């Protein structure tokens, strides 16, 4: 396979015939958040809400959100594909269909979805399709997965507002996929809160420099 063919393959979602089979049992992961000590898989306090963000390599994306006041816990994992309970190595092949994502569990009385969305839009480049900077492939695509129709509508409205802001600077279009949440599979313990365990580790987050115009009032 030529370099061009290999590159093109990495930028395409796999067919059902190509996807890896995965497994029935979940991949073992940490029980508690390395930074906060809160449970990664719950139970969480009443009133918490959830959203999944994909914005390239999940190491830097997770750190971005665990630092936000009102975020109760974060976890990295895989979503949006077909392979059940994939490993990191399988996901990196591009043959699971999954994106690297961050689960953000937050208290809406302290931080709003709009505030989280503003961080999402400003801290990566949502116009790059199946890549994020030097990280190339469907695994690194930009996604927002919500857990109800109301939150999906909020996310779509934020996308439209940010698209206009980008267009005013000659950038775009936005390629971020927004849907209600598919199955989420927790990544291995090694990847959870990676940049807290490895402060000098890789972080590929790079924004466009365009501010998000979303109203941030509660």
UniProtKB/Swiss-Prot annotation:
Catalytic activity: L-methionyl-[protein] + [thioredoxin]-disulfide + H2O = L-methionyl-(S)-S-oxide-[protein] + [thioredoxin]-dithiol; [thioredoxin]-disulfide + L-methionine + H2O = L-methionine (S)-S-oxide + [thioredoxin]-dithiol
The entry's keywords: Oxidoreductase
An annotated GO cellular component: cytoplasm
Documented EC number(s): 1.8.4.11
Keyword Transit peptide recorded: no
Listed Gene3D superfamilies: Peptide methionine sulphoxide reductase MsrA (3.30.1060.10)
Active site, UniProt feature: 57
Gene Ontology molecular function terms on file: L-methionine-(S)-S-oxide reductase activity; peptide-methionine (S)-S-oxide reductase activity
Stored InterPro entries: Met_Sox_Rdtase_MsrA_dom, Met_Sox_Rdtase_MsrA_sf, MsrA_MetSO_reductase
GO biological process, one term: protein modification process
Keyword Oxidoreductase: yes
SUPFAM superfamilies named in the record: Peptide methionine sulfoxide reductase
Function per UniProt: Has an important function as a repair enzyme for proteins that have been inactivated by oxidation. Catalyzes the reversible oxidation-reduction of methionine sulfoxide in proteins to methionine.
Family of this protein: Belongs to the MsrA Met sulfoxide reductase family.
Protein name as catalogued: Peptide methionine sulfoxide reductase MsrA
Organism: Brucella melitensis biotype 2 (strain ATCC 23457)
Lineage of the organism: Bacteria, Pseudomonadati, Pseudomonadota, Alphaproteobacteria, Hyphomicrobiales
This protein's encoding gene: msrA
